[in-house]
Amino acid sequence: MICIPVIDKDVSDAINSAKEALKYGDIVEFRIDLLNDVNFKDIEEFSKIPSIITIRAEWEGGAWRKSNEERIELLKNAIKNNAKFIDIELKEEKNLELVKYRNEIGSTTKIIVSYHDFEKTPEIDELIDVVEKELKIGDIAKFATFAHSKEDTLKILNLMNRYSGKIIAIGMGESGKLTRILGLDFGSILTFASMGGKASAPGQVDVKKLKEILKLIN
């Protein structure tokens, strides 16, 4: 799957961007933390669209500055409305609470548990530990680390291959672009691509360019 981040600040703009993005990608990621304002009704509307609902905490590189209680309740609302995916951080103490809630109400939402390092790509043993912890909590493990070298890129591709079909792995930055291009072939369930110059992380490839490259290599 190709996932296109939606990073608008207005709810109606985000809905329109998502509809346009789905002409090129398979799914969108709604970055709820970047919106000026959001309520339960908005989450219900977002959940109708094939998407990942992400409300990234400020302490994990996001922009959510309101209470964590409100953040968790909004994510529960996404689960209640059977959003395709939600994303919750590995470091979030209430991640298991969301999984328990999903199971109790019989929601079809898949839970992505994520980890970010915006400075470096840790050693492979540390990344394995992260992925194992994430898979004990949710359905899909995700990590995004900053790649500084070919060695970092190879580490990330190695992990994709090892956990094929249950991982999303990303190398941020110029050196990590190869992870975005080859990710699907190495076992990542999706790769992120930007549209119209709107990227949510460094190194995202434009969706049209990515599709051209994927067509050439496949």
Swiss-Prot record:
Gene3D superfamilies: Aldolase class I (3.20.20.70). Disruption phenotype: Deletion mutant is auxotrophic for all three aromatic amino acids (AroAAs) and lacks 3-dehydroquinate dehydratase activity. The keyword Glycoprotein does not apply. The active site is at residues 116, 142. It comes from the Archaea. Its EC number is 4.2.1.10. It holds the Pfam family DHquinase_I. GO terms for biological process: 3,4-dihydroxybenzoate biosynthetic process; amino acid biosynthetic process; aromatic amino acid family biosynthetic process; chorismate biosynthetic process. InterPro entries: 3-dehydroquinate_DH_AS, Aldolase_TIM, DHquinase_I, Type-I_3-dehydroquinase. Pathway: Metabolic intermediate biosynthesis; chorismate biosynthesis; chorismate from D-erythrose 4-phosphate and phosphoenolpyruvate: step 3/7. Involved in the third step of the chorismate pathway, which leads to the biosynthesis of aromatic amino acids. Catalyzes the cis-dehydration of 3-dehydroquinate (DHQ) and introduces the first double bond of the aromatic ring to yield 3-dehydroshikimate. Homodimer. This is 3-dehydroquinate dehydratase. It comes from Methanococcus maripaludis (strain DSM 14266 / JCM 13030 / NBRC 101832 / S2 / LL).
